[in-house]
Amino acid sequence: MKVRASVKKICRNCKVIRRNGSVRVICSEPRHKQRQG
């Protein structure tokens, strides 16, 4: 899980979603998981 000021899609499997007021990236590649904060 990377914590970043700006979350971006890295590959075509990445999806940007809002969960409990935080922006997250979920992906089939575990290294692409990000959250904003």
Curated annotation (Swiss-Prot):
Pfam families (alphabetical): Ribosomal_L36
Gene Ontology CC: one annotated term: cytoplasm
Disulfide pairings: none
Alphabetically ordered keywords of this record: Ribonucleoprotein, Ribosomal protein
GO molecular function: structural constituent of ribosome
GO biological process: translation
Family, per entry: Belongs to the bacterial ribosomal protein bL36 family.
Name of the protein in its database record: Large ribosomal subunit protein bL36
Protein's organism: Marinobacter nauticus (strain ATCC 700491 / DSM 11845 / VT8) (Marinobacter aquaeolei)
Lineage: Bacteria, Pseudomonadati, Pseudomonadota, Gammaproteobacteria, Pseudomonadales
